[in-house]
């Protein structure tokens, strides 16, 4: 009788390791599900592989893209967005995500002329671009539920003035914070860039630069 009791007790003492592995497995599965859920619905990290958004974003900058805002409100002019390639881009064999700045909202009329961008007849005050655009474009009217996007490095960006508009369903989220490199950590603010404002014409001089037809991938 005593021997049986001892053996049964020994078996009970051996069971916790099995429970430990089971709990560890549950924890890992839960963590993976949470990570996938956060990346799909809340936020994700992206890096910048090209110069098309300079000087705002530099090559190898690391950003957080939040995905909640556009579930609650419409995108706004001046916001930096990440989006999946449009049908026009897929037809040109682009399959990675792009990052650009929203310039034209649904219903806007946009044109680029003599180094300036005009939205609904008003010239944008763009203090964030690398150099004034050295091309002419438009006027075009942005269709419903679509957006016109341009790179801040206007003369070195493969954007809407080449391939058209971005449907809203292609938008993945809004770039709102840079977390690398450390000296440049901070929020990507766009309060001063959102609205088209009338300003005095300025004389821009900039040599034309061939566009860099490389998408902003992961």
UniProtKB/Swiss-Prot annotation:
<keyword id="KW-0645">Protease</keyword>
<dbReference type="GO" id="GO:0004252">
    <property type="term" value="F:serine-type endopeptidase activity"/>
</dbReference>
<feature type="topological domain" description="Cytoplasmic">
    <location>
        <begin position="1"/>
        <end position="26"/>
    </location>
</feature>
<protein>
    <recommendedName>
        <fullName>Probable signal peptidase I-2</fullName>
        <ecNumber>3.4.21.89</ecNumber>
    </recommendedName>
</protein>
<keyword id="KW-0812">Transmembrane</keyword>
<keyword id="KW-1133">Transmembrane helix</keyword>
<comment type="similarity">
    <text>Belongs to the peptidase S26 family.</text>
</comment>
<dbReference type="InterPro" id="IPR019757">
    <property type="entry name" value="Pept_S26A_signal_pept_1_Lys-AS"/>
</dbReference>
<feature type="active site">
    <location>
        <position position="100"/>
    </location>
</feature>
<feature type="transmembrane region" description="Helical">
    <location>
        <begin position="27"/>
        <end position="43"/>
    </location>
</feature>
<dbReference type="InterPro" id="IPR019756">
    <property type="entry name" value="Pept_S26A_signal_pept_1_Ser-AS"/>
</dbReference>
<feature type="topological domain" description="Periplasmic">
    <location>
        <begin position="44"/>
        <end position="218"/>
    </location>
</feature>
<keyword id="KW-1003">Cell membrane</keyword>
<dbReference type="GO" id="GO:0005886">
    <property type="term" value="C:plasma membrane"/>
</dbReference>
<keyword id="KW-0472">Membrane</keyword>
<dbReference type="InterPro" id="IPR036286">
    <property type="entry name" value="LexA/Signal_pep-like_sf"/>
</dbReference>
<dbReference type="InterPro" id="IPR000223">
    <property type="entry name" value="Pept_S26A_signal_pept_1"/>
</dbReference>
<feature type="active site">
    <location>
        <position position="52"/>
    </location>
</feature>
<dbReference type="GO" id="GO:0006465">
    <property type="term" value="P:signal peptide processing"/>
</dbReference>
<dbReference type="Pfam" id="PF10502">
    <property type="entry name" value="Peptidase_S26"/>
</dbReference>
<dbReference type="InterPro" id="IPR019533">
    <property type="entry name" value="Peptidase_S26"/>
</dbReference>
<dbReference type="InterPro" id="IPR019758">
    <property type="entry name" value="Pept_S26A_signal_pept_1_CS"/>
</dbReference>
<keyword id="KW-0378">Hydrolase</keyword>
């Amino acid at each position: 009788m005593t021997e049986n009791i001892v053996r049964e007790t020994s078996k009970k003492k051996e069971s916790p390791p099995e429970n430990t592995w089971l709990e560890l497995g549950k924890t890992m599965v839960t963590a993976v599900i949470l990570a996938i859920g956060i990346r799909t619905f809340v936020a994700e990290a992206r890096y910048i592989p090209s110069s098309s958004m300079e000087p705002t974003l530099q090559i190898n900058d690391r950003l957080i893209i939040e995905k909640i805002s556009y579930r609650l409100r419409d995108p706004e002019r001046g916001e930096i967005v990440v989006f999946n390639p449009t049908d026009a881009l897929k037809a040109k064999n682009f399959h990675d995500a792009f990052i650009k700045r929203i310039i034209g909202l649904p219903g806007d009329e946009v044109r680029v002329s003599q180094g300036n961008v005009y939205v609904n007849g008003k010239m944008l005050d763009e203090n964030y671009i690398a150099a004034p655009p050295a091309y002419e474009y438009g006027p075009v009217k942005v269709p419903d539920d679509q957006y016109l996007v341009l790179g801040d490095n206007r003369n070195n960006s493969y954007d809407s003035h080449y391939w058209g508009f971005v449907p809203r369903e292609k938008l993945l989220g809004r770039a709102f914070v840079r977390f690398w490199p450390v000296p440049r950590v901070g929020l990507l603010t766009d309060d001063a860039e959102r609205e088209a404002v009338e300003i005095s014409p300025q004389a821009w001089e900039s040599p034309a630069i061939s566009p860099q037809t490389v998408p902003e991938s992961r």
